[in-house]
């Protein structure tokens, strides 16, 4: 049954009345959208282990749905993607493209580009000029090889389109690749992003030129128009840009200021006004004769980058645009791409020529100029491959070229495959040639060792999720800082999850600020973030060097950023926030009369953050402390230090034995040196009944691993451990005997004794070891079902939400130099000596 767009109805009456929904516009659009999203998401999952950007999956998905693969089945094409439906699908996809280019404009900070310096500008110019010139040369060959005399496009427009296609760098895709490789906040990442931003702006200018020239018609037919038309189009486009930046930009600053009240809620009317502005700007440039996406992009540039308005605006629309509408555009591109059009050795030779020219031009141009401005050769080569990234903007150029009949089907398919190949090779190539992207770490000495050798400087890496962690971390760090340590250097790492959302990249730009990691450089008048403001005040009040850093990463690889930073900065201890946090009104003994109540229900920031902590504990190159915050640092519960900072008043250190507990008393000793901190050390002695009956630990069944504690698999010498424990205690007493209260207990029930300490109102903070090489008392708890096994048996008991514990908990793990692996265990009692092994038949 033949169809045309004018005779198609929007919706059907349903199958019960004899209608086929696929013969109606809206039901067919639903089916097309669902199929496109399902295929692109499936491919994204397949490509994820290869660390490829999502755009690769979407481009490949579009090609597979088109005539190159599934489209070879004509029944499928006629039913799912009939010709009459394509204008509808392309119109919906174009709306998504329009708003996505608005988001791209929001990502580009023009003031940041101006501050990027001559180095980035020089690299960008070289990265555009050489491939553009090479592209012009290739264009002559392709025009004379792949075009007939009847369909040859005009020289000018074809040369410009080919030059732009080969010289462009995809700014959003490059940002995503840099983030995946942990390079976004490095020097090379800063240079690449700045150069790509220059490149992006230049590409849009060249694209506007190409569109204006293409509007003049080609040699292959069509109505000839005066060359003055192209000139008028260009002048009108330039006038539009000037008007937007001079008139509209100040207006949008006013809108952003009015639209972001103090309660952080963006007013609906201002959001609607802005979205309408996107549509009007797109219509204006289409009216001029330049593609509508150019207007949306320029309008995005007018939105202020500081403040919350732009960020909130993106959060409102990006999921719908990037997740639903944008894949439709890739699909429409794929439906136009027929790889079968590349026939014969000559055509495949043209594909090879285009790929080699694109790669060589971009890489060589970038490399030469980067070396000239004193970038190391390895980094310069890496920059060349990074700048060779293509993506959505490349497809936009190609689709406009095909729409204007500048590119025929064969040339279009060749250039799409070129874009796909150059982007696909970026990640593996950069990982191969740029060593810092591999994430290797050195192993450092633990805190106890640093007491003897580097007492003049204590380096701490304090991680936080957001403003809620600031006061507790400052309070803890202030308690560790003493007058006897000449210098404390604090690295504050704000952990931010990298998602597929565009706003993640904007967060990175804010953090980077001209390339510096989560920076302490702010433009005049810019508001300090809530996270860093507290630490900046702390730095000014005390003798503490504070260096803010940002880690923007997917949660599965966040631990790599933390461990790498600990390695790079040679820190002695990493402090991690627990994934659960109690309300401050629950937290402290001074004001809380009951451990229960609503405050006893913790706020869970997410299981993903728990996994981050577990991976850091396993891979850290130094000692690690996990802070279970129950109101530590709240004004009501704390005492001011001499410099005005909050400090923990009363600290209890629980000691059973083992390396983690030895690290705990070392930390407790440092706290005792603070004049405002009172430290109590409670040593639990092994009961007489356990001295004659040793405990052997065996691996837990795989089914229950998440509910069992992890201990070290190295063979343990009980006598050696006992000797080390006694030595550590003697050393502790000799240094801090006059500053601490020391107690010894031999409990009948270890859990009851621990809970009595935690439920008392005597302490603000309890410090315990993780207990990976446990004493007999701690090992006896191995059969207990764990709620938080990563904290060890004692830490788990104190962190449990059902035990009504009042103080905050600090669980310490000493860095293990032996590189031994942890293994989850369950407990049995035997007559053998204490051992922890991998034998399941003990």
UniProtKB/Swiss-Prot annotation:
Ion transport as UniProt keyword: yes
Region: Disordered, residue numbers: 585-605
Membrane topology, record value: Multi-pass membrane protein
GO cellular component, one term: endomembrane system
Residue spans crossing the bilayer: 26-46, 55-75, 86-106, 122-142, 155-175, 193-213, 228-248, 283-303, 320-340, 353-373, 380-400, 413-433
Domain of life, per lineage: Eukaryota
Chief subcellular location: membrane
Gene ablation phenotype (knockout): Impaired light-induced stomatal opening.
Example GO biological process: regulation of pH
Localization of this protein: Endomembrane system
Keywords annotated in UniProt: Antiport, Ion transport, Membrane, Potassium, Potassium transport, Transmembrane, Transmembrane helix, Transport
Biased composition (Basic and acidic residues): 585-595
InterPro entries from the UniProt entry: Cation/H_exchanger_TM (IPR006153), CPA2_transporter (IPR050794), Na+/solute_symporter_sf (IPR038770)
Pfam hit, one: CHX17_2nd
Summary of the tissues where the protein is detected: Expressed in leaves and stems. Preferentially expressed in guards cells.
Molecular-function GO terms, alphabetical: antiporter activity
Protein role: Operates as a K(+)/H(+) antiporter that maintains K(+) homeostasis in guard cells and could regulate pH. Plays a critical role in osmoregulation through the control of stomates opening.
Family statement drawn from the similarity comment of this UniProt entry: Belongs to the monovalent cation:proton antiporter 2 (CPA2) transporter (TC 2.A.37) family. CHX (TC 2.A.37.4) subfamily.
Protein name: Cation/H(+) antiporter 20
Organism: Arabidopsis thaliana (Mouse-ear cress)
Name of the coding gene: CHX20
